[in-house]
Design a protein with these regions (language model features):
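Switch II (G3) loop of P-loop NTPases
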Residues: 106-123
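Walker A/P-loop NTP-binding active-site region of P-loop NTPases
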Residues: 30-88
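Inter-motif core of Ras-like GTPase G domains
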Residues: 121-147
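Conserved beta-strand segments of the P-loop GTPase G domain that flank and frequently precede/overlap
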Residues: 63, 110, 140-145, 168-173
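Beta-strand-loop-alpha "switch" segments that mediate conformational coupling across diverse proteins
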Residues: 173-178, 182, 189-245
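Extreme N-terminal, non-catalytic leader segments
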Residues: 1-32, 99
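C-terminal accessory extensions appended to soluble enzyme cores
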Residues: 6-16, 152-153, 229-263
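Conserved C-terminal guanine-recognition region of P-loop GTPase G domains, centered on the G4
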Residues: 128-129, 134, 148-167
Length: 263
């Protein structure tokens, strides 16, 4: 559970570390989802983020680290040939981040699995200082829903990652009238926002008649909006316009965080 005293101690510790290790200005960035609770919409947001980069003609490397989600619903289910599946449950942990950045695009989008917390935290504890010294920055994406467990998951990750990452929190409205009172009103969430100043974005509720077949067939909002698919039920004029509207507004939200998404 998130603790403001722990956070303050962590901030001092990591700030002191950076004063000893002179880190260059970031030239590369890893954007990773904070795992923990599954089914909150992490992959849905990462799909939109990948299309946002694509719309700006910014090259990225897509990594699917969700080893439990083997087929439908995984990042690879949507982008397949563009996505590399990585098993982080090895002694090397998240070293794949460093290797892919050294070989390719300056930005990595990493969709983490629900059980990735311990591996991620241990890797940051052992590798962060040396990796940061090479000019690599990190942005952690947290997804909150009306379920308090989604909020607790983010607070737990933040208590371990501390200020070694920048934070973007996405309020995912999974119902038509979503209630985010726990995220917005709980004392621990307020402490998190005060200490780490996350950029908070909104991902609006999507009609089930669009969202469900899109997941089933592995198609993105962009593919629906631009009619780049062969799924009859998603070619209805109303759903095409809906997809265009959802994507436009979500891109506008992502624009608010671009300072934490680019190197």
């Amino acid at each position: 559970m998130y603790d403001s005293n722990t956070a303050a101690t962590g901030e001092r510790k990591h700030s002191d570390s950076r004063s000893v290790v002179s880190s260059p200005a970031p030239s590369k960035r890893v954007i990773l989802t904070m795992g923990g609770k599954g089914g909150v919409g992490k992959t849905s947001f990462m799909l939109a983020l990948a299309e946002w980069f694509q719309s700006h003609e910014i090259p990225v490397t897509l990594l699917d680290l969700d080893t439990e989600n083997k087929s439908r619903g995984s990042l690879k289910h949507y982008f397949d040939g563009r996505v590399t599946k990585v098993n982080i449950h090895t002694a090397a942990g998240l070293d794949a981040f460093v290797d892919h950045l050294a070989e390719g695009a300056p930005i990595v989008l990493a969709d983490m699995g629900a059980s990735s917390g311990q591996v991620t935290h241990e890797w940051f504890d052992s590798m962060f200082e040396d990796v940061a010294a090479t000019g690599l920055a990190f942005t952690a994406i947290g997804i909150v829903t009306p379920d308090p467990a989604s909020v607790e998951s983010i607070l737990s990750w933040a208590a371990r990652l501390q200020d070694r990452v920048n934070y973007v929190v996405v309020e995912n409205a999974m119902t038509h009238q979503a209630d985010f009172s726990y995220w917005r009103g709980s004392e621990q969430a307020k402490q998190f926002r005060t200490v780490f100043q996350p950029v908070v974005l909104m991902m609006e509720f999507r009609l089930p008649e669009l969202e469900n077949p899109a997941r089933q067939h592995g198609v993105t909002l962009g593919q629906i909006a631009e009619r780049r698919l062969k799924v009859p039920e998603l070619q209805r004029a109303s759903l095409v316009i809906r997809a265009q509207s959802y994507r436009r507004r979500l891109f506008e939200e992502i624009d608010k965080a671009k300072g934490l998404l680019l190197p």
